[in-house]
Amino acid sequence: MQLLTIGINHHTAPVALRERVAFPLEQIKPALVTFKNVFLGPQAPNTPEAAILSTCNRTELYCATDDRAAREGALRWLSEYHRIPVDELAPHVYALPQSEAVRHAFRVASGLDSMVLGETQILGQMKDAVRTATEAGALGTYLNQLFQRTFAVAKEVRGTTEIGTQSVSMAAAAVRLAQRIFEKVSDQRVLFIGAGEMIELCATHFAAQGPRELVVANRTAERGQRLAERFNGRAMPLADLPTRMHEFDIIVSCTASTLPIIGLGAVERAVKARRHRPIFMVDLAVPRDIEPEVGKLKDVFLYTVDDLGAIVREGNASRQAAVAQAEAIIETRVQNFMQWLDTRSVVPVIRHMHTQADALRRAEVEKAQKLLARGDDPAAVLEALSQALTNKLIHGPTSALNRVNGADRDSLIDLMRGFYQHAPRSNDQSGH
């Protein structure tokens, strides 16, 4: 089985492309079924395995397959699934085989490949991806082992290095940007759209600034209400957004919507109602919640996840020593995993040997039972049984020895001596 990771992320593709390749949660299970079918074939000795990781910053396909053309098949599937021409998608895609795929998984889970160096959210997202793949019946021995070791490595990296300390989160970066627009965040009204983990983090950071008002709008009213109450805020129906948008100076949005929920026209009306007082907007969703054209309005300051990433990266340089430590740990664990993977390659051969030997045994036992039932001498039957088993079990090795010549023959002889420890060595002339 070959391991392969294929995907795009914030290093290789802008948010405009990432949002087109993202998988909504409800689509992942059925997508896994069609993705696995790419690698199914009559010649495949093993069932292919797959998992999909889709976040704001990356969409990645992890697979284990016998298909030697897996890279081309995976890229073609991703292109067809999202209806994006291969020529448009391919320049932004990375394909990582074997040890590169393992190293990448370890780095991603440890926060080394994140926009926010050392952030922990990605680890939870990977665990969710594995849980979804398991429920879809898409995981097997290889990816299960890969992800279990991935989680163990992430725990080791975070427990033995300072990779996650003093990191500037996306939420903190949003507050810093708001402070560039408004002298005091405490004088502003803040609206959060959504009630997921990212919005919760942002609400925590903005609430620490003591805003004039904090409001949460969410499709599920109960969940929005609970989040608002945590920060002494209020909840409002998401349906009221078009008519109340003008009330807010700061708007932070991060929902799972597949289409924008804030359009250009609605923001234009809000700006007019505010008499052109500025609105600071942060769109942390992928796909985006706010139409990108909104950013062209004169009195609107719109920032996406990629924009916040520039601020986040400013704080990454100071932790390069921790990065070096983490990379060293990961490299050791990659080698350990590849050793395990190498041992797995002989499992089908061993299984076949067991099956073949057992078939020979059963055939000879059945023959012996018939002879005994006929009344033949038990001692003679047992002797014939043991002789037949001996001849059949050594037939393969002796035939192989007779077929090869030269260096191959010498290598095979040495190999056979290892199998049969009592075989005499070439310099043993005693015959014993």
From Swiss-Prot:
The keyword Nucleotide-binding does not apply. Its EC number is 1.2.1.70. The active site is at 56 (nucleophile). Pfam families: GlutR_dimer (PF00745), GlutR_N (PF05201), Shikimate_DH (PF01488). Substrate binds at residues 55-58, 114, 119-121, 125. NADP(+) binds at residues 194-199. This is Glutamyl-tRNA reductase.
